[in-house]
């Protein structure tokens, strides 16, 4: 089972500074692993421990993202891949989704892709559906728990009526 976890380097929550134009000050600001991405890594590692496979952390960013990726490896991921190019600095979610999907393809594809719900710095939540669409994969969003049995992924998530169980076939 080849599992990819998308992670993001975000400004440290305790040190967020807002510029006069209402954008986050990123230059020189301390950064950290997006907190909800930690849960995605933990879920991916739990699946790997249950059925075997490899967990690869994938991120797009500058060289400083390497430190953040070490945190993910400490949680239990097997390796990390950083996609970095100055031409991608400040890219929007459309470009980011395309680059990350192409990176997953270059890595040989993925049986499962885990992400956090959204990043603390952008809060758009657009990357998971963009990746699923580009890779032709099913998307199970807002999962609280995940399990894999044979060729089926089962997840539970909260909805307006309580707890919902959803399933999707592995590629």
Give residue ranges: language-model regions.
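N-terminal glycine-rich FAD/FM-binding segment characteristic of electron-transfer flavoproteins
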Residues: 1-171
């Amino acid at each position: 089972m080849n599992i990819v976890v998308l992670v993001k380097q975000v400004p440290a929550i305790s040190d967020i500074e807002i510029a006069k134009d209402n954008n986050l000050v990123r230059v020189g600001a301390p950064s950290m692993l997006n907190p909800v991405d930690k849960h995605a890594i933990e879920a991916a590692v739990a699946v790997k421990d249950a059925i075997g496979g490899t967990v690869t952390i994938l991120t797009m960013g500058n060289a400083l993202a390497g430190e953040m990726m070490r945190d993910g490896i400490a949680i239990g991921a097997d390796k990390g891949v950083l996609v970095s190019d100055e031409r991608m600095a400040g890219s929007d979610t459309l470009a980011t989704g395309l680059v990350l999907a192409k990176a997953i393809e270059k890595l040989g594809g993925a049986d499962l892709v885990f992400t956090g719900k959204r990043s603390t710095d952008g809060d758009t939540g657009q990357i998971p559906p963009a990746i699923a669409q580009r890779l032709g994969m099913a998307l199970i969003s807002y999962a609280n728990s995940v399990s894999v049995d044979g060729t089926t992924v089962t997840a539970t998530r909260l909805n307006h009526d309580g707890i919902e169980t959803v399933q999707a076939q592995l590629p």
